[in-house]
Swiss-Prot record:
Every Rhodanese domain range: 790-889
UniProt cross-references to PANTHER family, sorted A to Z: SERINE/THREONINE-PROTEIN KINASE PLK, TBC1 DOMAIN CONTAINING KINASE
Protein name stated in the entry: TBC domain-containing protein kinase-like protein
UniProt-annotated location(s): Cytoplasm; Cytoplasm, Cytoskeleton, Spindle; Midbody; Early endosome
Signal peptide positions (record): none
Domain Protein kinase: 1-274
Length: 893
């Protein structure tokens, strides 16, 4: 979007036509409200950016099908010129006409027609240049079908529009749409407007509306419409004095037959504008982030750089995009409906005044005044930025231009000031509503994202603090490593040819996050369908499973106007977190995943694990929808956004920690209930505190050895050329264990049945060496740095017999022989070694032995005794022997 600069923002409102409540669609579901349909169609208007068009910013839905639209606005319009009654020069007429044609031509290029062109909708900025307002009303209302008022003004409607009349569908279940107006209809409207500017007065003012329409239709019988209009309004002398170019222009616009009337594109290239067009360089839309063309191709700098900073009183806020300014305006307390209420555009009527005077037995009522609220109020209210500017008055100019190359090592988190670093410690919900904080984060992320992928490392660093909601979609794409010409790839996929999956997709979409207005709109459904189908078609080795629609929802919501980016994000997300989950036979992948999850529950919360296993409430009964959809099936979108902000920074094992964190929030209720109550509890999941869930899942992740979540069916290591260079920017929090180079000390794959038989997870010998710091602290890869005063995080329990232990053991380990460790009841036999074990309760305990069965059984006994963080050394002591790290106790003399 363009910067706000000298323009302002305005709000206008209208009502969508109400639908009957007792009618269902052809699919048996209630009809989608017209306001929802309009809201969905509106979104594409936000992407149409041109100097001659007022930028659309937002639309909100109120009560009783009310819609409020926010858009770029200018105080002056051609209406003001007409009100002054001054004649406009021929050269100025040609300039105005050319600028209007520029806007119309760009709209037509995007498949849109204005249809409501009038002097009040042709705005003038402070430099006198044209900006077309309300150009999207005809498009968003489905050519006027979804509203009870006509689109357009009687005096400016083209003859073919009047001849068609106002068509309203009689049956709401049928798609009876009128024939849409074409680009040539706008040229007639432009011709009437230019005629009015030439003569300095409005036409048809003495005629009733019906007479006006009738008069326009009768113009088909005359040869020279311009002369007839001049004679009717007594201004023939003025018309005769106009330049030949202007008269020719008026005649071309006011051609009665649409077939003989030019399009805006054709008229723009007419010889009439041969001189005018030279003063207007062609408009090139800036290349997007994921573009196949160089983003800096059209970058130009002034010859004298000092010209950029000559004005000391720069309005830095006005240099930000309209979208950003509007977002900050809302954070600073801005409310569209409230602004309209203050200007008395929205008026509430006491309910008693709406009662009828007389009601018959059959329900027919009489005596009610006509409700005029459904008609169009064309007023646009200017939104005041005073409150926002007041909030930002203490923000210095340097905040709008952060330096990205400076060494900011003195700041704990961010490139922001010390106050912002302090604000970064506030709860996320407060940070996201803080105007100053969000301004700084948006400006910083905007600059970093414009330098993507060069600034990929810094994007990762800043995302660990938080992600500004306004830029979440594009930031997620950067975190997922999306690059290249994504639009061309998406366009190349066949999304039209019917496939067997179509039926299932059609069934699933109307049930996916339909509480959200955007995703429940017909436009949202169509985009869902295309993105899902593109993914299915482009992954022939995978299949569509129910839940894929939920997985798609966050990406589609954040990139509603960029299906290609939503598809690219989804295609990057699934291999990382859900590798092979969508195979036709995915049972081995799912079973391994759930088994590792069970081990994680036992590792972090043995008491809860014991209880769930005793009542038979296994993860297969509740966790498949969690992981298959990465929690999008169980949480609303606003919670998913905060959850995934952290998930995308973690590796593929992080979802296990999220799952355990959810269970721990429900811990008391789960421990107090049996199988049936737990099933009921998870059928309607209680409210989960997502911020707490994220905080606890990070803590759980830090306590989990990297190799404990190893899965043989996880994504294999990528080639260097496939990783997009992201690996270098990731911390150990983000890199998968599978990505690390394989060695003799790495974990080995085991059969699924053997994995299921073990309650506690295995860890690799290299993890054990790192955690014990046997190779020195410089090689530690764990997320938590060990301080000098802290106790060891880990205890090694060697369960071999004492003779084997004395021949060689891991430094710092204790010996608890398996054969004599437990009583018949399963309790630990008390001895100095078990006392040490009890003192380490709460830290990581690694069981080491010769026989796998014994180590697994010993670990299971400890879990039964509610020892947390118990794991098994993969490969036993034999894995450590070749390293030369075993020690022999000094002989007792």
């Amino acid at each position: 979007m363009f910067p706000l600069r000298d323009t302002e923002m305005g709000a206008s409102t209208f009502f969508a036509s109400a639908l009957p409540h007792d009618v269902c669609g052809s699919n048996g579901l209630p009809l989608t409200p017209n306001s929802i349909k309009i809201l969905g169609r509106f979104q594409i208007l936000k992407t149409i950016t041109h100097p001659r068009l007022c930028q659309y910013v937002d639309i909100t839905r109120g009560k009783h099908e009310r819609l409020v639209v926010a858009a770029e606005h200018c105080e002056n319009s051609l209406e003001d010129l007409l009100r002054e009654g001054k004649l406009v020069s021929s050269s100025r007429i040609l300039c105005i006409a050319y600028e209007v044609l520029q806007g119309l031509q760009y709209m037509n290029k995007h498949g849109m027609v204005h249809r409501a062109l009038s002097p009040r909708n042709i705005l003038l900025d402070r430099k006198g240049h044209v900006k077309l307002a309300k150009f999207g009303l005809y498009h968003m209302t489905a050519q006027g079908v979804d509203v009870d008022f006509p689109i357009g003004y009687p005096s400016y409607l083209a003859p073919e529009v009047i001849a068609q009349g106002m068509v309203k569908p009689s049956d709401h279940t049928q798609c009876e749409k009128p024939l849409p107006s074409g680009p040539k209809s706008d040229l007639w409207s432009l011709g009437i407007i230019l005629f009015e500017l030439c003569v300095g007065r409005k036409l048809f003012q003495t005629l009733e509306i019906a007479e006006r329409l009738k008069f326009v239709i009768t113009l088909g019988y005359v040869d020279d419409i311009v002369t007839v209009l001049a004679e009717e309004h007594g201004c023939l002398d003025i018309i005769k004095d106009l330049s030949e170019n202007v008269i020719t222009l008026l005649k071309k616009c006011l051609t009665f037959q649409p077939s003989k009337r030019p399009t805006p594109e054709e008229l723009m290239h007419d010889h009439l504008f041969s001189e005018v067009s030279l003063t207007y360089p062609p408009f090139h839309k800036p290349a997007g982030l994921f573009s196949s063309s160089p983003r800096c191709a059209d970058l130009t700098l002034p010859e004298d750089i000092s010209q950029l900073c000559k004005d000391e009183d720069n309005d830095y806020l006005a240099e930000r995009s309209i979208e950003e300014v509007y977002y900050l305006w809302c954070l600073a307390g801005g409310d569209l409906e409230k602004e309209l209420v203050n200007k008395e555009i929205i008026r509430s009527k006491p309910p008693v005044c709406t009662l009828p005077n007389f009601v018959l037995e059959d329900g027919e009522s009489f005596g009610q005044g006509r409700d005029r609220s459904s008609l169009l109020d064309d007023t646009t209210v200017t939104l005041s930025l005073c409150q926002l500017r007041n909030r930002l008055k203490d923000v210095g100019g340097e905040a709008f231009y952060p330096l990205l190359e400076d060494d900011q090592s003195t700041l704990p988190h961010s490139n922001s000031s010390s106050e912002l670093s302090a604000a970064a410690n506030l709860p996320l919900i407060i940070r996201e509503r803080d105007t100053e904080y969000q301004l700084n984060r948006i400006v910083l992320f905007d600059r970093l994202l414009k330098a993507y992928p060069y600034k990929k490392n810094q994007i990762w660093k800043e995302a660990r603090v938080d992600i500004p909601p306004l830029l979440r979609g594009i930031t997620w794409a950067a975190l997922l490593g999306v690059e290249g010409a994504i639009q061309a790839k998406y366009d190349a996929i066949d999304k039209d040819t019917p496939i067997p999956t179509d039926r299932q997709i059609e069934v699933d979409i109307p049930r996916c996050h339909q509480y959200d207005e955007l995703l429940s709109s017909p436009e949202g459904h169509a985009k869902f369908r295309r993105v899902l189908k593109a993914w299915v078609v482009s992954h022939p080795d995978l299949v569509y499973w129910q839940g894929l629609d939920s997985l798609c929802a966050p990406f589609l919501y954040l990139n509603f106007n960029n299906e290609a980016l939503a598809y690219a994000c989804m295609s990057a997300f699934i291999p990382k977190y859900l590798y092979n989950f969508f195979l036709k036979d995915n049972s081995h992948v799912i079973q391994e995943y759930l088994t590792v999850f069970s081990q994680m529950i036992a590792f972090h919360d043995p008491e809860l694990s014991n209880h769930l296993n005793e009542i038979g409430f296994i993860p297969d009964l509740y966790a498949i929808p969690w992981f298959l959809t990465m929690f999008t099936h169980v949480f609303p979108l606003h919670k998913i956004f905060h959850l995934w902000d952290t998930l995308l920074l973690g590796n593929s094992s992080f979802p296990f920690c999220i799952g355990v964190a959810i269970l721990q929030q429900l811990r008391d209720r789960l421990l107090a209930n049996g199988f049936n109550e737990c099933i009921l509890l998870f059928s309607d999941l209680p409210e989960i505190d997502i911020e707490r869930c994220v905080r606890e899942s990070i803590n759980l992740f830090r306590w989990t050895p990297k190799s404990a979540t190893y899965r043989q069916y996880a994504q294999p290591p990528r080639q260097a050329n496939e990783s997009n260079g992201t690996r270098s920017s990731m911390s150990c929090f983000s890199v998968d264990y599978q990505e690390a180079p394989r060695g003799d000390l790495s974990r080995d794959s085991i059969k699924l049945d053997d994995l299921k038989a073990e309650v506690s997870p295995r860890i690799s010998a290299e993890d054990l060496i790192d955690l014990c710091e046997l190779t020195g602290p410089s090689h530690s890869k764990t997320p938590i740095k060990k301080t000098k005063s802290s106790k060891p995080k880990l205890l090694v329990v060697d369960i071999r017999n004492s003779e084997d232990f004395n021949r060689g053991h891991i430094s710092g380990s204790i010996n608890v022989p398996f054969a004599s460790a437990f009583t018949a009841e399963g309790d630990l036999i008390q001895c100095p070694a078990t006392a040490t074990l009890q003192s380490f309760k709460g830290r990581v305990v690694v069981i080491v032995g010769n026989a796998v069965k014994n180590t697994a059984a010993f670990a299971a006994h400890l879990v039964k005794s509610k020892y947390p963080r118990v794991c098994i050394l993969d490969g036993g002591i034999n894995k450590i022997k070749p390293t030369g790290l075993l020690t022999v106790p000094s002989p007792q003399i």
